[in-house]
From Swiss-Prot:
The lineage of its organism: Eukaryota, Metazoa, Chordata, Craniata, Vertebrata. Phosphorylated by CSK on Tyr-238, Tyr-343, and Tyr-391; Tyr-391 is a primary site of phosphorylation. It comes from Mus musculus. This is Inactive tyrosine-protein kinase PRAG1. Gene3D superfamilies: Transferase(Phosphotransferase) domain 1. Keywords: Cell junction, Cytoplasm, Nucleus, Phosphoprotein. The gene is Prag1. Catalytically inactive protein kinase that acts as a scaffold protein. Functions as an effector of the small GTPase RND2, which stimulates RhoA activity and inhibits NGF-induced neurite outgrowth. Promotes Src family kinase (SFK) signaling by regulating the subcellular localization of CSK, a negative regulator of these kinases, leading to the regulation of cell morphology and motility by a CSK-dependent mechanism. Acts as a critical coactivator of Notch signaling. Residues 317-333, 526-538, 1139-1167 have a biased composition (Low complexity). The modification Phosphotyrosine is found at Y238, Y343, Y391.
Amino acid sequence: MSACSDFVEHIWKPGSCKNCFCLRSDHQPTAGHPKARANSLPAGTRLPARPENCRLDDEGVNGLAYSKPTIAVKPTMMTSETSDLWTEASLSAEVPKVNWRRTPGKLLLPKQEDEPIVYLGSFRGLQKPASPLACTDGNSRCPPAYTMVGLHNLEARVDRNTAFQPVSFQEEKAGREELPSAHESFRQKLAAFAGMTSSCPKGPRPCTSPQPLRESLPSEDDSDQRCSPSGDSEGGEYCSILDCCPESKDAVHSTEGSGRRGGDCSPTCREQGPRTRPTEEEKQGLSFPRECCGQGSTANPPRLGPKKPSLNSEAASSSDGLSCGSSRSGASSPFAPHLENDYCSLVKEPASGKQQDLSGHFLTSGKCVGQAAELQPASLLRDPVQPEPIYAESAKRKKAAPGPPRPEPKKEQVPAGHSQGQVWTGDTWIQKTPPSWSQDREGANPAPQVATTITVIAAHPEEDHRTIYLSSPDSAVGVQWPRGPSNQDLQAGEEEPLVAQGLTSRESHPHNVTENTAKEKPAIPPKLSKSSPGGSPVSPAPPLTDHSDGNTGGSSVGPQLLSRVPANLTSSCHTNGVATAGDSAKCPPPATSSSVLDQRRPRYQTGAWSRQCRIEEEEEVGQELSQSWGRELENGTADHSNSSTWHRLHPIDGTSGQNSKTNSGMSKSASFAFEFPKDRGRLEAFSPPPPPPKSRHLLKMNKSSSDLEKVSQSSAESLSPSFRGAHVSFTTGSTDSLASDSRPCSDGGPSYEPTHSPTISGKKLFAPVPFPSGSTEDVSPGGGPAQPPPLPQKKIVSRAASSPDGFFWTQGSPKPRTASPKLNLSHSETNVCAHDEPPFNCSLNSGNRSHHVFSSSEPLGKAFKGNAPWAPALGLANSKGGCGSPSLQCRAATSTSSSQLSVSSQASSSSTQLQLHSLLSSISSKEGTYAKLGGLYTQSLARLVTKCEDLFMGGQKKELRFNENYWSLFKLTCNKPCCDSGDAIYYCATCSEDPGSIYAVKICKTPEPKSASYCSPSVPVHFNIQQDCGHFVASVPSSMLASPDTSSKDTAPAVSPQPPAQEQDCVVVITREVPHQTASDFVRDSMASHRAEPEVYERRVCFLLLQLCNGLEHLKEHGIIHRDLCLENLLLAHCNPQSSPGPSATPTVPTTTSRCPSAAPAATTACQGGPGEKQLPRLIISNFLKAKQKPGGTTNLQQKKSQARLAPEIVSASQYRKFDEFQTGILIYELLHQPNPFEVRAQLRERDYRREDLPPLPTLSLYSPGLQQLAHLLLEADPIKRIRIGEAKRVLQCLLWGPRRELVEQPCTSEEVLCNTLHNWIDMKRALMMMKFAEKAVDRRRGVELEDWLCCQYLASAEPGALLQSLKLLQLL
């Protein structure tokens, strides 16, 4: 470490100075060879050197040149004296201590004289004898390959309430020359333990080279200590021992002393049973509640170079969760080769002639290079040193779900001779003590705290291979996102890493299992489940087929994400916080989950990844979806491990050309916004803000899945184009909601397996992603069984049942694992909003890189297309979300997800019972029953109106905004204009970013300076108001501005101007509604039909006028007066809800384009005038250049002050108050093929006219008198007498749907009797309407039409008083 004292806030990269973030080589000369430190103890006799003096940086080996991951760390004072960067909050017994282990910048083969390095985590100086932890190697000596032992907050039983002091890198702390008494005692403990653990089995079971111990640092607020397996809250802290035993069989014996030095607890060696190795040395099962022992003798030079332990950034550090990098992962390990069994304390199972997998490789990111090499000392290092993983853990403090405050770990059935307190970890028994509850920071709250941990681990920091592990035990959030390397070193002897979440069932790796382990039953993973209470026997997990290379022997442990596991670490698969993922490592049942979790607020760490992940955890203690979808397919091996919350993505380095594959799966327990920049190589630190508490959002995958796959497509040779090695497995198990439906997979309950891989879920939202033929997804290199047994089906009670957006992934019917991974969003039609491009548009070449995090409830601000907020659940059973291509271009409609349906049914069950009881209370009374039926019809029609609006509006209710930057993305689909209105010419166009939708390019005819001020009304989207999706000035060919009539030849084929064409700057408006004609065209073309079928035509005119009134009423509600209502400004668009986005999986196609299946036919149809005339067209009000907005509608304070000085007549805009009504009266004449009366009779404008002065309309149908009366009412010369647009709408409704004159022409009827009659009529019409909808619902040939929607609007709001007033206006009374 450099002695640099310049501290800057920057991004630290491995090999960089932690103070100034420059290269370490800039300050520090590289020593030629590691030398024995002055105060280092002799091997086997001396205490391990003080961490301050253990300078891994001085080892004299240049660091590897690889793209170093960036870790965002707080600018904290780093000690310059120690390369191991100890951050000591305090070594006193009261305060836990944080270790900042610094990654050695050099990788070297340690010399014999190097002593093991022991990292002491926070411990509270309470002494406790530790049960033996076996150095699983057969050698009795563990070489000193930089054994790094991290002991995390081992709290003293005496001081429970001591709040953890914030980590401070003060020089006085790091520079202290004298060890505190606690430190001294710990050194004695280490010496004692070194003697204990030095006995590593030889040869056949070599200890792997020291894996950098990635233990999480306790957060500042990590006052609450984890539940340790020891009952007295000290044992079983998250201690991890990095075993550094050379692969050579003649490992030099390290410190042998096993006595309790200085009264410190000395680990006791315990015989664990006969070994299958030649060296029948005892297996040392050490449960170090408080001591972490550094193993490794300096005498024997290990082959394995010391690996660079990654510095856990403070934000990412978890006090208990031990993030460990293991060399067994198929991904490039950050550590040197031959790191087989990284932690002696972890389970290491001797396999005859084969290397044993270390169960508990939390992140096995390195290839299993040492498997055969360990067994064969002559074998050379085959795996280049891999970059270290990056771990980021974030915990948030939350109250545990009510439950027993001190749950006891379940007894595991163990062979005779092993006490109940001992826990079998693979082949090592570890002393297991009852978990102790650590107090809250204040210590005031004795109730257990449940912590939510998010662990972000970029296991492969190098450019081509990155894995991000996101895990949260509490909120059931776990994501591992591996990016397979483009060029992985596929070694013939290397085994594809098998990622076992906590254990591989003993049948999985029979060749790796010792006799001892074969007899043991797997235990529950540390991810605790309420469903398996303490004391209940643990049933063995169903065996999962091991597809790892049989030749390499030990199953390679794939990258395994271990978030803060419950304190019952030693008893759980995670030995000392390390997930034991050994071949058949069995983990005893952990302590119950909800009580033992870390309770810290979420902290986000960027693991050197150019992708950005945000997890919004849900702080919820209620039931959570306990399904775990982590599917481990390292060579098709499915090892379901401890926690249902673990989501494991295993990038596998296929040996001998194996394709590295990973499963992709997602579970909803948190909102994920994966924003991936298009430049993968660009390293950027991203620290998302903490999510709002109690917030649940839909899976915000704003970036298209192309980004997901781009993240994972780094493995060029092995993964399919669409999903190269990207496996996003989000399992949804939550530690505090596993009560009734999920036991951890390692619990082995045969009834179900929480680790359901989303790829095998029955209901897939996305189509399978094909992998190349060479894929060995389900075929092990050794020819092992291809598929694990089908997962048993279980019934899930989702925590998302209360999710407002109903977005959760529920577990589908279990199926055998499919060969090709699918990005499966579960079975519910998740509310995935299309944004900027389809949410999972997994086309590899998608150019869209803009990211916008949005929820399903918020408007699609910049999206190219929206989703229907209500879409009928798309076949909740097995809808594929409309994803039909391998590129997963799925536009998942925001549909009512199955969770929402179940939630509504569950939540409303009680209210429904009450409502039913109320409805049936007066069942004996016919009048009361009819009255209640009428109310039910009214409510149903109101709901139908809303659903019809969603059906007809489709995805257009979401607002879109295009700017000039998108102009080049649009391409015309037809050379001819689709419509020529009064102010603009419309062309059909498609956007390259959204090829499935058709837009209208409106090129304004008015000069650019005048039309540049064009602004659409600032009103919400309405069915009858033209929606401005963006307007800007653009250069267009002059030929495009020519009228279709005058343009005899095709215009430019595209919007881009042709070189010879003369360009003109015009205002271009992008709209969703593609008109096919104006009302003027409609009137001109329908003269013959009006004469032939006057009633049909005039009824259609009534519908057009009704839509006009609806639009004008919407504008007036927002204080806007159009002032330019003419036939040319009224556009007609085709409306066909059957192909609208509501019921379909592609909700973004505008309804106006439903007239044809594809863009080109749509444009052609538009140019030719559209389909048959039977369908009612959609009327759209356009051209707001003359529109006025009433004063007072602004929110600008200055404008409000100015308007406060206006005269009343100006403020009231009395001259414009009923301006649109008057123009609507004129339109009635023009629509009925009559001239404007004020053009024919100019004298009407010069004097006050009366109704009789207006020209009469010809009576051709039963609608003619009503239209004549309505025109007179709208053309009243006195604005006060002129009816409002709302009244005109109700008059039109009466004309269209009644009541008829016969109903009200009863002599001598009072108004009260007439009102009762009208009330009964409304009830009858509502019942008939409900019947009509019911019949159309089951008739596929018939669909809901625009007329039905308009009628629903009328009947839903009709009431006798308004009907009576309308009848009077029509002079029907």
